[in-house]
Amino acid sequence: MYPTDLSDSAWKVIQEILADKRKRRYSLRSIINAVLYVTKTGCQWRMLPNDLPPWQRCYYYFHKWRNDGTWERLNKSLVCKRREKAGRKPSPSVGVIDSQSVKNSEWGVPDKGFDGNKKIQGRKRHIVVDTLGLVLAVVVHAANQHDSPSARAVVARLMAQGYGRLEKLLADSAYGEKLRQWAKQAYKLTIEVVKVCDLPGFHVAPMRWKVERTFAWMAWSRRLSK
């Protein structure tokens, strides 16, 4: 047992979403436990402890579920359940979009670039969260891509998941007029730029701070810190 292992109650929820009752040599629960272990500790796949399934099998499912949308389906189902538990409707009506550039290691990282604004060599993760800070969509790309044109990919991924009530995304000034027009025409989605107070000193941007908090949550896991 590791601190990252799924509890019985958590696995029961995920098992219902996966709806897969086939007998396997390695259970899907143990596979997900291995993925969570890698995410939290940041270890290499080949360095997985011996009491977890073979790393090749774990990576196979991680890669397969990334490509076939299983991770997105799991995330959406869990987001909807969490929102209902908080007394909200399953589908959000407002989201917050932002990006974060992070440094990468020298080896094994495709699509790297240099973010001239943040002075960071690495990749940029573009995310959309709801007003609870729950992640709705993610796209990762080279850090040298500007927020406005690359945001189309994350907006398209977000809308493809079928959040029917979504009407507005809150953003910073990096998201230009062309992007806002495109989102309105393509998805009838309003992208509203939330301005920071003009007074001297530090001021929290209304609602936009929630996406920054989500980035901070990500940093709790070593695999997501780079």
PLM regions: where:
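Short alpha-helical elements
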Residues: M1-K226
